[in-house]
UniProtKB/Swiss-Prot annotation:
Gene3D superfamilies: Alpha-D-Glucose-1,6-Bisphosphate, subunit A, domain 3 (3.40.120.10). The keyword Transferase applies. This is Glucose 1,6-bisphosphate synthase. It is an enzyme of class 2 (transferase). Pfam families: PGM_PMM_I, PGM_PMM_II, PGM_PMM_III. Alpha-D-glucose 1,6-bisphosphate binds at R73, S175, D336, R337, E434, S436, K448.
Length: 622
């Protein structure tokens, strides 16, 4: 009897007006319990309410996600600040409202939806389910939806948006983030990620459409609506056909004795990399059996980010040794990024950094262009791009070879946007990259692409093998010709936003108000560029040429010794990242000296500017 009474009391509590003492929270609780139709996430909020956990309720319900460098990204779970059924429905309603305003032919052209293999049992939240709900919201409004019938690499969504002439698309993914996370990555009609003002306008529309519409929860529409189409076979076929544009040695590939191991990090990449190798004439790469199939728990790696290096590549490296394969290729869980490693003569593995791979890609794509260009092709119309925190090696190659190099803000959305401008003006973009192992060869896709990058590295390695040159040896040749570019990138974790803000504000008011530092330890600073405020001391008017980005922190220091160092916050994770590079001329070949100088400068940067002990920063652990 007592148990029944308690149950009745709890039931009454959950259906009565809420009196937490915080009117904003009371309203948010009521909205969530009325709107959420997912039993598991609804129960999470009910349990918090029942147990009087008002602080956690406030954290979950009284703030919303905002667009970062990769759209919406957060942990999966109950609450308006998390990725879940309700927030994805709200986001898609906002998307619909904005797209309806922007495109009079929205209901003729349609919308693309793709997804990876993430999922969380406790919130009954998976990428596939979120993709179906995204489609359902639009189908209920009579919008044609191209919903992939199975998981796909992230690059397939921007590719499909372009090829199908859709107005926009969404990929449900959190890429290489921890297993608890998911995301909502938005592409515009151009096939590039959205930039301002679209992101801000979409957020406004989301805030105006928070209550689910009739039909928004009806995921049965995915199975019954004649407006739902499956683009998988068509897009996969066209994508693989377009890959041939960046294949230059198919016959050589078919004869190579090199063997490759590929790991897809428990994600989507396996089938698509196998197909890409076939297109290029290769035998299939050897898959890592434990990591070949999708697994939302990423069971065999401590974090699903191949950028973390040898510690997360262990299974693939051991398999390569067993199979006598010299090159290991690792695509991240949504297959938009690539890591590569090569076995050296001393039996050790060389895991290439993103900047080192970019040096090889830059050399390779330009070399192939020179050998295959048409008679009237002009090198002055050729471009390569990189984000401003990435290596300057492409700049050095461009200066010597006569093509153009440009920098963009961090994030491939800026690269994609700039590529569109260049293509519209008759320019040719051969290659673009960001240091965090994001590469784009050619312009068939306007986002980073791990599938195409993997097979291009394989072709490069096979070509070099015919001359008895390894990837590492070719990298040295690139540096000897264009100048050594020695870089180091790492990060600190910081879970306190006020601490992050105070670190950067201190740098803006270092010795006195509105004065940036003139030295970092003993290292003299030549120029300072602050993207957050739009300041650049190297410009005559002291204004940055790159767009201002007030929502993120980013300061770049150029030193008198030729080093460039950037401190910035991550758009998707609680990190302060640092990027430092020594850019040497070709006559400076003492790498040990350059590395020692870089190490000393980084130590000074950390000690003087970040002050990890004082600020409670957590060192990256690998």
């Amino acid at each position: 009897m007592a148990e029944n009474t308690e149950g009745d009391l709890n039931s009454n509590l959950l259906h009565a007006p809420y009196h937490t003492g915080d009117p904003q929270l009371d309203t948010a609780i009521g909205q969530w319990l009325r709107w959420d139709k997912n039993p598991k996430t609804k129960e999470q909020i009910e349990n918090l309410l029942r147990n009087g956990m008002n602080k956690e309720l406030r954290d979950r319900l009284c703030c919303r996600m905002t667009f970062g460098t990769a759209g919406l990204r957060s942990a999966m779970g109950a609450g308006f600040c998390y990725i879940n059924d309700l927030t994805v429905i709200q986001s898609t309603q906002g998307m619909y409202k904005y797209l309806e305003r922007c495109f009079s032919d929205f209901k003729q052209r349609g919308f693309v939806v793709g997804y990876d293999t993430r999922g969380q049992v406790t919130s009954s939240c998976s990428s596939q389910r979120l993709a179906k709900l995204t489609a359902a919201v639009l189908l209920a409004k009579d919008v044609p939806v191209y919903l992939f019938s199975r998981y796909v690499p992230t690059p397939f969504v921007p590719y499909a948006v372009q090829k199908l002439k859709a107005v926009a698309g969404v990929m449900i993914t959190a890429s290489h983030n921890r297993k608890e996370d998911n995301g909502y990555k938005v592409y515009w009609e151009t096939g590039a990620q959205i930039t301002s003002p679209h992101d801000k306008e979409i957020l406004k529309c989301i805030e105006e459409c928070v209550e689910p519409w009739n039909g928004s929860w009806n995921d049965n529409l995915v199975d019954t609506s004649p407006l739902k189409r499956d683009p998988l076979q068509d897009i996969c076929r066209r994508y693989m056909e377009d890959l041939k544009k960046i294949c230059f040695y198919r016959e050589l590939n078919s004869k190579t004795t090199l063997k490759f191991v590929h790991t897809s990090f428990h994600g989507v990449g396996h089938d698509y990399v196998q197909l890409a190798f076939k297109v290029f004439g290769f035998k299939p790469p050897i898959p890592v059996p434990e990591q070949k199939d999708p697994d939302p728990d990423f069971s065999t790696v401590k974090c699903p980010n191949p950028e973390e290096g040898e510690s997360v590549l262990e299974l693939s490296l051991r398999l390569a040794e067993k199979e006598n394969a010299r090159v290991v290729l690792a695509t991240d869980p949504d297959a938009d990024r690539l890591a590569a490693a090569e076995l050296q003569e001393n039996g050790c593995w060389k895991v290439f950094t993103g900047n080192e791979l970019a040096a090889l890609f830059g050399w390779w794509m330009f070399d192939c262009w020179k050998k295959n260009k048409s008679r009237n092709a002009d090198v002055k119309n050729v471009y390569m791009l990189a984000t401003t925190v990435s290596s300057k090696i492409l700049k050095a190659i461009a200066l010597k070879e006569g093509f153009h190099f440009e920098e963009t803000l961090p994030g491939f959305k800026w690269i994609g946007s700039r590529i569109i401008d260049l293509l519209e003006n008759g320019k040719e973009v051969l290659f673009a990259f960001e240091e965090s192992i994001g590469f784009l060869c050619g312009t068939s896709v306007l986002d980073k692409d791990g599938v195409s990058a993997a097979v291009v590295v394989a072709e490069m390695a096979s070509y070099l093998e015919t001359m008895n040159i390894t990837l590492k040896q070719q990298l040295v040749k690139v540096y000897e010709k264009y100048g050594y570019h020695i870089s180091k990138t790492s990060y600190f974790l910081c879970y306190e936003p006020p601490t992050i803000k105070s670190i950067f504000e201190r740098l803006r008011n270092f010795d006195s108000p509105k004065e940036y530092p003139k030295f970092c330890g003993t290292f003299a600073i030549l120029h300072v560029r602050d993207i957050t405020t739009g300041y650049d001391s190297s410009q005559p008017n002291k204004k940055s040429v790159l767009p201002v980005s007030k929502n993120s922190q980013m300061i770049t220091f150029t030193f008198q010794n030729g080093c460039v160092a950037t401190l910035r916050t991550s758009g998707t994770e609680p990190k302060i990242k640092y990027y430092a590079e020594m850019c040497a001329s070709p006559d400076q070949s003492d790498t040990a000296l350059l590395e020692e100088e870089l190490k000393k400068l980084i130590d000074a940067l950390i000690e003087n500017f970040l002050q990890p002990s004082k600020n409670g920063l957590i060192w990256r652990s690998v």
